Structures are given as C-alpha cells and as structure tokens.
C-alpha cells in the first residue's frame, strides 16, 4: 500500500537522490540546496511505496517566501495568494502507481485550507518534459506565460490552476 507523510529533515539525503535521478526534467541540487528549499516550503510531503520507502516528494511555498527563483519571482509579481510548487519528483519505480495524483489531490486540499486562490508551477519545455505537462493539464493547470531561465539554457511553461 502506498501513502503520504510529511517530509522530515532526516529524509533530505534520499530526496536529493530522487531529485537528481530526475535530471534533466528537474535541476540537480545539493543537500544544502534541498535543505534550503525544505526550510522555505510550507508544504513538504513524501510519497511512500508499500515498503514505506520514499519514492517521491513535493515542496511548495506560500507567497512572501524569501526565494529568489526566477519562476517564483515571476508568480509573486502576478499572483497575490498562490501556492507555488517548486518541485514534485518521483523515482522511476513509482510511476503509474497513482502517487502523483494522490500527492496533488493532497496539495490542492492543503492550498484550499490555507485560503489560496491558485496553485502555480512551471514545467520545462526545453529540455522537454511532456509527461509532466500532460500530468499538470489533468489537474486544470492553464498557461500563464513562458520564460527562459538559467541564462537561456532552460525554457519553462509557467502554469496556474485556479482554486474554486
């Protein structure tokens, strides 16, 4: 059986491994960088397989976080009351198990209980991540804009899902 639980600091080394195995769909991170993201995040959730092992995670931030990501800054300038998903990553072994759906349903519920009016995120267009774009479309994410980041080496689709 699969489940979700709050991430803890002791999980972060495993989170780095899962994250970096997802490259180039997600940027590589060090333990220090993931710890900083963890500390900035108001939503920190792990997805577990039937053995209780972390096979995926999500980190998301409230408005007003002291975060200098080009994408977060873009949304901060356009949305007053959003929950920004910095990353959602799964190990290959977790794909197709419904964990992404479970995690996003939980995240959207969290955003609603926080009184947020939208969930925001970005998905890579270059390098392409078509699976993630399809996944986000299923949750009602709509195009806001595109943006070149990291000196033009990455192009992202900026997305938002309005919350009713």
How should these model regions be labeled?
Residues 86-95, 125:
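A short, internal acetyl-CoA/4′-phosphopantetheine-binding micro-motif in the GNAT/acyltransferase core
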Residues 111-125:
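Conserved GNAT acetyl-CoA-binding A-motif
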Residues 101, 125-145:
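Conserved active-site alpha-helix within GNAT-family acetyltransferase domains
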Residues 59-87, 151:
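Conserved acyl-donor/pantetheine-binding loop and adjacent beta-alpha core of acyl/acetyltransferases
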């Amino acid at each position: 059986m699969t489940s979700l639980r709050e991430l803890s600091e002791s999980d972060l080394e495993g989170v780095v491994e899962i994250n970096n195995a997802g490259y180039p769909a997600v940027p590589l991170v060090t333990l220090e960088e993931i710890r900083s993201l963890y500390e900035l995040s108001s939503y920190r959730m792990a997805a577990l397989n039937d053995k209780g092992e972390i096979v995926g995670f999500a980190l998301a931030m409230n408005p007003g976080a002291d975060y200098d990501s080009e994408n977060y800054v873009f949304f901060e300038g356009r949305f007053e009351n959003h929950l920004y998903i910095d990353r959602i990553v799964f190990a290959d072994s977790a794909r197709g198990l419904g964990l992404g759906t479970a995690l996003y349903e939980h995240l959207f519920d969290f955003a609603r209980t926080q009184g947020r009016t939208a969930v925001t995120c970005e998905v890579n267009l270059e390098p392409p991540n078509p699976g993630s774009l399809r996944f986000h479309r299923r949750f009602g994410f709509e195009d806001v804009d595109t943006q070149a980041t990291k000196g033009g080496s990455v192009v992202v689709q900026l997305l938002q899902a309005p919350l009713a």
